[in-house]
């Protein structure tokens, strides 16, 4: 009698799988992402006024440092200079302060929890590109408080010993290893606040 639910065919001692449509398919889990925005109204006129032309200059250098095994950037560690990255300047308004506080309370990238500025708020910004030494400039700034942000990618080289074989002379046994290198890519978010107190001054800042 033929078995209509048979999923294997046996011929000459060989087993062949036969495709049978499953009655149930488990759906993939969707990555849950939470996005938060400040619950404060954005004053575009205030932001526009803060970004109007002045006569002060903000000059800075952007860099990061490689974290140690405890996830800490050592104070005396070598600088990794920000080569050709975009630095964004935002005016520090009440809306921005609400966003910054909300980010401290809610942001958790591992749990896919993000805090964003509104599109209108992010539109009021200035941008600069660093040179190969990490230097950048924002000219013609008015007195005020500003927030700087950039994302600095870099590659960390690590090493390990790969076992290649064993030799024995009958008395002693020796294991041999080759030193191998591999790379890990990182991207650090670097930020700083800067205050321009008066027109005509040059304010220097370290963005790290």
Question: Where do the language-model regions lie?
Answer:
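Bacterial Sec-dependent N-terminal signal peptides
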Residues: 1-24
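Primarily secretory-pathway and cell-envelope proteins
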Residues: 23-108, 157-208
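Short, acidic Ser/Thr/Gly-rich low-complexity loop/linker segments typical of extracellular
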Residues: 95-103, 112-133
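Short, surface-exposed beta-strand/beta-hairpin micro-motifs centered on an aromatic residue
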Residues: 132-140
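A short tyrosine-centered beta-strand micro-motif
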Residues: 141-150
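Short, charged beta-turn/beta-strand-edge "cap" motif at the junction between a beta-strand
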Residues: 153-154
